[in-house]
Swiss-Prot record:
Protein name in the entry: Ribonuclease pancreatic
Active site: 36, 143
Tissue expression remark: Pancreas.
Keyword Transferase: no
Glycosylation sites: 58, 86
Length: 148
């Protein structure tokens, strides 16, 4: 009888372990925003900044991400945008917020002749207002929507 119970519990334990292991490795939307769009340490005047950062942040694996923006402000300043002016997101959702002031950003755009695996980006340092989507409790940035 003990062996039968063990054989019944074993598949259940394997399923539970697999679920726990896969959920531990998942990146939240807020963590993805941090990885894709935050560089609080400051911008670089190097023309290769985007090439380095896109690779370092795993945005050139399997394909070249065409556009990305890095925000060079303290995390607290970017999180504060979630309580600023509410605007409509590009996709029509109503959870986007526009910064009151222009922030330091770097715009990375894939050069026209660039192809994977040799992703080559144009680096543009700018000061613009940012529009970000915010969600959760606490309310935090989860998506970079635009710069204006």
């Amino acid at each position: 009888m003990g062996l039968e119970k063990s054989l019944i519990l074993l598949p259940l334990l394997v399923l539970v372990f697999g679920w726990v292991q896969s959920s531990l490795g998942k990146e939240t939307s807020a963590q993805k925003f941090e990885r894709h769009d935050m560089d609080s340490t400051g911008s670089s005047s190097s023309a290769t900044y985007c090439n380095q950062m896109m690779k370092r942040r795993n945005m050139t694996q399997g394909y070249c991400k065409p556009v990305n923006t890095f925000v060079h402000e303290p995390q607290t300043a970017v999180h504060a945008v979630c309580s600023q002016k509410n605007v409509t997101c590009k996709n029509g959702n109503s959870n986007c917020y526009k910064s009151h002031s222009a922030l330091h950003i770097t715009d990375c755009r894939l050069k026209g002749n660039s192809k994977y695996p040799n992703c080559d980006y144009q680096t543009n340092q700018l000061q613009k207002h940012i529009i970000i989507a915010c969600e959760g409790n606490p309310f935090v940035p989860v998506h970079f929507d635009a710069s204006v």
